[in-house]
Swiss-Prot record:
GO terms for cellular component: cytoplasm. Its main location: cytoplasm. Disulfide bonds: none annotated. GO terms for molecular function: metalloendopeptidase activity; RNA endonuclease activity; zinc ion binding. It holds the Pfam family YbeY. Single strand-specific metallo-endoribonuclease involved in late-stage 70S ribosome quality control and in maturation of the 3' terminus of the 16S rRNA. Belongs to the endoribonuclease YbeY family. SUPFAM superfamilies: Metalloproteases ('zincins'), catalytic domain. This is Endoribonuclease YbeY. It comes from the Bacteria. Its EC number is 3.1.-.-. The keyword Nuclease applies.
Length: 140
């Protein structure tokens, strides 16, 4: 299940996101939708990077047995709008790409240190759900 916290004016359709999440996990996901100023604060606090970013993931501690929550994904709608326009696809498609990217981080994938597994899993999901190329795929 996706627990949506949306502090923006954008309508977020969680049905497709639920379908994607359910192919990878049975755990719950907290999805927080914000603007650049809010994600910048989080980026500074947790990564010591004082600028906005597109998506952040906060996995739960797996030492807790049977924890129903996988973690939290935070997405900036400002980035979604910008990239959707730049790459000529819909807001919903770009949002879904960022959701997939964040979800894979919650599941332990890390494109910054792995041998391409994160990119390959993203490509698999992009193809399965008929989405345009994601940032990680566009940059490879």
């Amino acid at each position: 299940m996706i627990d949506l916290e949306n502090s923006t004016e954008f309508e977020i359709d969680t049905l497709n996101l639920e379908n994607i999440a359910n192919t990878l996990t049975t755990k719950d996901i907290e999805l927080i939708v914000v603007k650049n100023d809010e994600i910048q604060e989080l980026n500074k606090e947790y990564r010591n990077i004082d600028k906005p970013t597109d998506v952040l993931s906060f996995p739960m501690n797996f030492e807790v047995i049977d924890m129903p929550l996988l973690g939290s994904i935070v997405i900036s709608t400002d980035f979604v709008q910008e990239k959707a326009k730049e790459f000529k696809h819909s807001f919903n498609e770009e949002f879904t790409l960022l959701f997939i990217h964040g979800l894979l981080h919650l599941l332990g994938f890390d494109h910054e240190i792995d041998n391409g597994e994160h990119r390959l899993k993203e490509e698999e999901l992009i193809e399965k759900f008929k989405l345009p190329s994601s940032l990680i795929v566009r940059n490879s």
